[in-house]
């Protein structure tokens, strides 16, 4: 088994067979069921963590390799970094970061109360270095837990795809309030034409690039254009916005699994410097 990764600015081109499959699967889930899924979104994620405990996702040790902002507290002794992990799950990204960098303080929140409990039960959890809380990012005000403009970086890693597209902007506006001017949201999520998107069976489609899994959790598959517009409309500036292509090849089985992710950085604009007394008199 081997994995190969590359980056690019264009979405993955589908094979003829893949295109035909997507064309066949155009029927949408009924409006009634879609409303039920939205209403029960938190319950479905809580049940997901009840079934899978902390075993479903692997720890994400790649984040500091891909995002230099998460390494910034290593450059100078005593330099601190304050992070918000929006949608922390059971801590697969959070705890590798806390373990690697003793100068990191993290706020972490999740939609699922059960996931938050798992984070608090983790042997590396330390309330002096991490504040974790339950939060619906589309509705609950982050300022109830995090001071305004106090965070050096926000991670949104495989989080926004689980939110209804009509509510994604609310998440971005919410984290905007706690992010320092000139600092960035670090984003990675499912990209258009990812292998997972093509595996959905007929009857799973909720809307354009939006699907429901059998367990009731939902997933959106992003294009770079859609994501850029979403962030820019919420007041951010685009820094990096590119596709990541990973192919997992099993030569023995003759399998090649094409994964597509979107990896991006969007910056909160820096504040204009206050005018000096000299410039004010001109």
From Swiss-Prot:
GO molecular-function terms, A-Z: enzyme binding; tRNA (cytidine-3-)-methyltransferase activity
Record keywords, A-Z: Cytoplasm, Methyltransferase, Nucleus, S-adenosyl-L-methionine, Transferase, tRNA processing
Catalytic activity entry: cytidine(32) in tRNA(Ser) + S-adenosyl-L-methionine = N(3)-methylcytidine(32) in tRNA(Ser) + S-adenosyl-L-homocysteine + H(+)
Positions contributing to S-adenosyl-L-methionine binding: 45, 49, 87, 110, 136-137, 157
UniProt GO cellular component terms: cytoplasm; nucleus
Annotated Pfam families: Methyltransf_12 (PF08242)
Keyword Cytoplasm belongs to the record: yes
Primary location class: cytoplasm
Single GO biological process annotation from the record: tRNA methylation
Disruption phenotype: Mice were born with normal Mendelian ratio without developmental defects. However, male show a significant reduction in body weight over time due to reduced energy expenditure. Cells show reduced N(3)-methylcytidine modification in tRNA fractions.
EC number: 2.1.1.-
Keyword Glycoprotein assigned: no
InterPro entries, A to Z: Methyltransf_12 (IPR013217), METTL2/6/8-like (IPR026113), SAM-dependent_MTases_sf (IPR029063)
Enzyme class: transferase
Record's subcellular location: Cytoplasm; Nucleus
Subunit-level organization: Monomer. Interacts with SARS1/SerRS; interaction is mediated via tRNA(Ser) and is required for N(3)-methylcytidine methylation.
Task of the protein: S-adenosyl-L-methionine-dependent methyltransferase that mediates N(3)-methylcytidine modification of residue 32 of the tRNA anticodon loop of tRNA(Ser), including tRNA(Ser)(UGA) and tRNA(Ser)(GCU). Interaction with SARS1/SerRS is required for N(3)-methylcytidine methylation.
Membership in a protein family: Belongs to the methyltransferase superfamily. METL family.
This protein's name: tRNA N(3)-cytidine methyltransferase METTL6
Originating species: Mus musculus
